[in-house]
A protein has these predicted regions:
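Residues at the starts of beta-strands that form the adenosine-phosphate
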Residues: 70-72, 151, 184-185, 216
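Phosphate/Mg2+-binding loops and adjacent switch elements
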Residues: 79-109, 113-211
Length: 221
């Protein structure tokens, strides 16, 4: 069954690979250039379609900023929201208007941050620059090359590590494994409490076939 499935999906995955590789090439070659903003931008994203544990990382960074008394912004696409366009979230918003994760961020961090949603993240970044919001956490932006990033964090689930996955629709990858090399930090989420040293070493070895060997690799529960 898998053999015939692979035969069917392989050509589609190659078309998907072509377009993602073309987009990356246009930015890597300088034909397209990212916009440069004053704000310090931390991007938290993944290589796969679907969840991989980004939200706890966004919340961890948020709590760090709060501890340091830094006002910041969290910018999300607002996945599954019923609205469109650029929205600065307020107490009247809910999952329908801004999405599940932004609502969660709003409920937890609204006293210390601006939560924004936009299909075009540059609208939010322009707002931050114009309103002296100097620190931005960009949720799910690993594939977005349209703006500069100071730190690019890649999240991969322990249960579905990117180094074992394949390009959609043969697998769940949005782009080739080799693009993990863009990550400044690689974090494995949902790791078991009893994950041993040898298993961690194995994950590191397999990850570094694709990631930057200088990038720290972390393991979280």
């Amino acid at each position: 069954m898998n053999f015939f499935k692979n035969i069917l999906f392989f050509p589609i995955s190659q078309i998907f690979r072509f377009f993602t590789s073309l987009r990356n090439f246009l930015y890597d070659s300088g034909i397209l250039k990212p916009k440069i903003y004053k704000s310090k931008i931390i991007s938290v994203g993944n290589l796969i379609m679907g969840g991989s544990g980004k939200t706890p990382t966004v919340e961890y960074i948020s709590r760090y900023y709060i501890k340091k008394k830094i006002f910041f912004s969290i910018v999300s696409r607002g996945y599954k929201r019923k609205s469109r366009g650029f929205i600065i979230a307020s107490e009247k918003d809910n999952p329908k208007s801004i999405g599940d994760e932004p609502t969660q961020y709003l409920n937890k961090f609204s006293n210390y941050s601006k939560v924004m949603v936009s299909e075009n993240r540059n609208y939010a970044l322009e707002y931050c620059d114009n309103n002296d919001i100097n620190y931005v956490i960009m949720d799910d932006a690993f594939q977005n090359h349209s703006f500069n990033k100071d730190v690019d964090i890649l999240i991969s689930s322990y249960n579905r590590p990117f180094f074992n996955d394949h390009i959609f629709p043969m697998g769940m990858l949005r782009e080739p494994r080799k693009n993990a090399k863009r990550a400044d930090i690689l974090i494995y989420s949902n790791c078991p409490y009893d994950m041993g040293t040898e298993e961690r070493r194995n994950f590191v070895t397999k990850s570094q076939k694709y990631s930057d060997k200088k990038a720290p690799i972390l393991f979280t529960k």
